Amino acid sequence: MYRKVILAMVGAGLASFNALYCTQALLPVLSEDLHVTPATASLTVSATTGMLALSIIPASIISERFGRKRVIMLSALSATLLGLLPLSMSVGMLITLRGLQGIAVAGVPATAMAYLSEEIHPKHVPQVMGLYVAGTSVGGLSGRVIPSGVLEFASWRWALAATVAVAIIFAFITSWALPDQQRFQPKRLTFRSEFSAIAQHVKNPRLSALFTLAFLFMGAFVSLYDYVGYRLTGHFGLSEGVAGAIFFLYLSGTWSATQAGTMIHKFGQARVLVGSIVGMMIGMAVLFSPELISSILGILLFTACFFAAHSVVSGWVGVVATTNRAEASSMYFFCYYMGSSIVGWLSGHVLHSWEWGGLVVWLLAGLAIATMIALFIARTTPSTRSTPSPARDSR
């Protein structure tokens, strides 16, 4: 029934999230080739996610005025056509182009959920939304695995070129397949009214707690995957291409995110959230081990639990926010990607100063704070045993 919509949205997720993380697997090589520290190399990821975070709310406002389809198509195409990355002659130019990609990518996560909520029958929204999320997951995976694989026989510039080529294909599929909107009603929104709605959400202590969790979760997740390559190539002596295979553990998150809904039905949101954070901490603690197999198992557990926690928290935002839910969702993703940008960059300095053990302690400290926040939310927010539907703007 919704084949073209599904094809288009999966393509948008693949194209945009492929572009978003295409340098993450290359950080050790960038450090060596461009003679920069891990923290500086990580700016090729942090600049992208930071600019994405700053652009999500403006992109959402623009989509309310000019339509979701236009924003999604422009976002997917421009993010991939900014594929001048392989031509970058300096780290400064590379970081600048990556920041521009972040602005371009923002249109997809800012509007995709709203498009599906408006155009898909409510009965089918969860299934179609799940396929879109799967597309973003596989897109993020391909953006990491493709360049790391190409590194086995070519330079990082060719690795990025290969990633961009794949993203362009999916961007044009999105442009061809995405149907015209039938139920969209333009709204004359202003930045002032939108930020006023967001300010009301920030003043809500339960929503602020959920936003903070998004910041801490994503910060820890991206930090781990930003710098685990240095551990795998340095301590364990793996090649860059083999080390890139660690990103296949990302697929455990595709499974755990879908299982989170089942677990919520059985145990409630609070228990699933706290259990997921504890699992993340156990997985992180295992990374103190000097053994490769133990480290892989730790990353596997951490990744699966991260996606479960993200699924719970993002759904809970729509429950706690009884009005202006679109703005609450935008604020959630703003904090989510700012965590990636800020914590990811700071973690590079921690790694440079205190090496791997210091990085693990730093990330565990953030997860300990997240545990306390989760316990606060569990005490102050009713925990339902139903999976919330995607949030709609209830104004």
Could you tell me what each predicted segment is?
Residues A270-V313:
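C-terminal transmembrane helical hairpin of 12-TM major facilitator-type secondary transporters
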Residues L54-V91:
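Conserved MFS/SLC helix-loop-helix module at the cytosolic interface between two early adjacent transmembrane helices
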Residues I56-G67, S256-G268, L351-H352:
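Helix-to-loop junctions at the C-terminal end of transmembrane segments
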Residues G92-Q101, I293-L301:
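Paired small-residue
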Residues R70-L84, R271-A285, L364:
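Structural signature of the two symmetry-related core transmembrane helices
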Residues P179-L210:
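Juxtamembrane intracellular "pre-TM" segments in multi-pass secondary transporters
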Residues L97-T136:
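Cytoplasmic helix-loop-helix junction between adjacent transmembrane helices
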Residues P122, L131-P179:
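Helix-loop-helix hairpin linking two adjacent transmembrane segments in secondary transporters
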